Amino acid sequence: MQWLAIGLGAAFGACLRGWLARFNPLHHWIPLGTLGANVLGGLLIGLALVWFERMGSGLSPNIRLFVITGFLGGLTTFSTFSAEVFTFIHHGRLLAALGLVGLHVGMTLLATALGFYCFKLVL
């Protein structure tokens, strides 16, 4: 049952990631789909951390596997992000690479904190 929860979650997350990838060509140095997937993943993991903390042991472990390992694992794009940064470096665009790293890390951390604290206020 655990593998099914992870697999189904990953399928949904990957589908959303694929849809978001359509936005990558809209800007010449910021792959917006990748950034959107990572920022959304950061926001959702913040929400999930609070939700799972509040639900405690009354929640099936398979739900956590579905959401965090599956869905968010399928949605977020660290390997794609790494490839995009490397491509900038490889083409001599070091400032663009550094800017992209700062943008992804900074916005994802902010989104995680936003999701965490906003959801904590609601619950």
From Swiss-Prot:
Family annotation (Pfam families): CRCB (PF02537)
Gene Ontology BP terms? cellular detoxification of fluoride
Q: GO molecular function: any one? A: fluoride channel activity
A single Gene Ontology CC annotation of this entry is: plasma membrane
Catalyzed reactions per annotation? fluoride(in) = fluoride(out)
What's the stated role of this polypeptide?
Answer: Fluoride-specific ion channel. Important for reducing fluoride concentration in the cell, thus reducing its toxicity.
What protein is this chain from? Fluoride-specific ion channel FluC
Which source organism? Psychrobacter arcticus (strain DSM 17307 / VKM B-2377 / 273-4)
Top-level taxonomy: Bacteria, Pseudomonadati, Pseudomonadota, Gammaproteobacteria, Moraxellales
